[in-house]
Amino acid sequence: MTTLVIHAPYHRVKSGAKSFSAVLATGIGDGYIITPTEFNVLNSSPNISVVVLDKDRRQRAEGILVNLVPTKKANNGGQRYDVYIKDLKTFPYKSASLNRNGVTVIVC
């Protein structure tokens, strides 16, 4: 099973990022930089789960990946993707290590 973990931190809401509750309500995480290596792992894996974290407020939700839609490129050239998620449900908080883009891909 492959899991995509994305971070929706409360402290980024002031600068225009979508809040954890907005991701939970819409099922869309906006503009996450996913490296080509991470994308290839996700693209070749069936049944990908998604974990949405807010480490600031210690919140966690889990769902199923529906689609990764490329959006604009980041200033560093990294490709940004909107992450579409279905069946999001909240769970007790459990942290995960993230890269500097607020993303990690876990393959079990």
Task: List the model feature ranges, each with a label.
Residues 3-4, 50, 82-83:
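A broad, low-specificity signal marking well-ordered, structured residues that form hydrophobic/aromatic
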Residues 56-108:
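Aromatic- and Lys/Arg-enriched surface recognition patch
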Residues 43-48, 64-68:
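Short amphipathic alpha-helical surface micro-motifs
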Residues 48-58:
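Short aromatic-glycine motifs in intrinsically disordered, low-complexity regions
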Residues 1-44, 55, 90, 97, ...:
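Compositionally biased, charged N-terminal/linker segments
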